[in-house]
Design a protein with these regions (language model features):
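Serine-dependent carboxylesterase/thioesterase catalytic core
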Residues: 81-169
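Active-site catalytic motif of lipid deacylating hydrolases and related acyltransferases
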Residues: 22-100, 203
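C-terminal catalytic-base region of ester-bond hydrolases, centering on the histidine
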Residues: 152-232
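Solvent-exposed, acidic/flexible segments
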Residues: 39-50, 69, 73, 107-114, ...
């Protein structure tokens, strides 16, 4: 099943900084929202929940939103640094780091990737307002680094499918609030269950693919993101 996750999409050419459309550096007080996709999904696949939400969030004043492939964490990190470099000197000052407003969300392997990215930002002294993981897959996707203010986790544990991370916890509970560890259920043979967009996903993706296709999940993710956008 893990092999299926990696092969479920056709491999595409790698994403680069020039594929990201947000203005750099970010305008003052703007929030940068980065969604990271699972599997080997293409960064601009319009059928993926990560991409759909990024495009929707772009319509919000004061928000810059991008979707990034999980193999491109380095690209995401460079983009964030470029976005925060308000004076263009390629060195982030204490003030430039302090003013960062960053939100990260990811699905499947993208859930693990956003925590890799958050840890890299932590090493650079860059704060993160929120991380949201959707059916996150990975060995290091349950400890939320101390630079993250709040975190939420959604998962499923149905039979014959990839299981998402069940419980995230804060490396430092005094600095990070865990908002949710919420389980979704997708029983087999339920007629009104979410339906993935392709036959391959419907046939072999199981509940992991159904969760990715569930609009209720993405409404929850969006709700947490919009709450974080109000944070001062």
């Amino acid at each position: 099943m893990v092999i299926f996750l990696l092969l479920v999409s056709v491999a595409a050419s790698g994403q680069s900084l020039r594929d990201l459309s947000s203005t750099t550096p970010l305008p003052p007080n703007n929030t940068l929202v980065i969604g990271i996709l699972g599997g080997i999904e293409h960064w601009n696949d319009p059928n993926r929940g990560i991409r759909k939400l990024a495009l929707k969030l772009r319509q919000t004043p004061g928000v810059s939103a991008e979707s990034i492939e999980n193999r491109r964490v380095g690209t995401a990190l460079r983009f964030i640094e470029k976005s925060l470099d308000t004076n263009g000197d390629r060195v982030l000052s204490t003030e430039e780091r302090r003013q960062a407003r960053i939100i990260l969300y990811g699905q499947s392997l993208g859930g693990q990737a956003i925590l890799r990215l958050a840890r890299a930002l932590n090493k650079r002294g860059i704060p993160v307002l929120l991380t949201v993981q959707v059916d996150s897959v990975g060995r290091t996707d349950h400890i939320i680094p101390s630079n993250v203010r709040a975190a939420a986790n959604f998962y499923q544990h149905e039979l014959l499918t990839v299981w998402g991370e069940t419980k995230i916890r804060a490396a430092d509970p005094q600095k990070t609030t865990i908002l949710a560890n919420r389980q979704f259920h997708y029983p087999p043979l339920v007629s009104d269950a979410p339906k993935p967009d392709t036959w391959v996903r419907r046939r072999f993706g199981g509940a992991h693919a159904r969760m990715e296709a569930d609009p209720i999940v993405w409404k929850e993710v969006e709700s947490y993101i919009r709450q974080a956008l109000k944070t001062k």
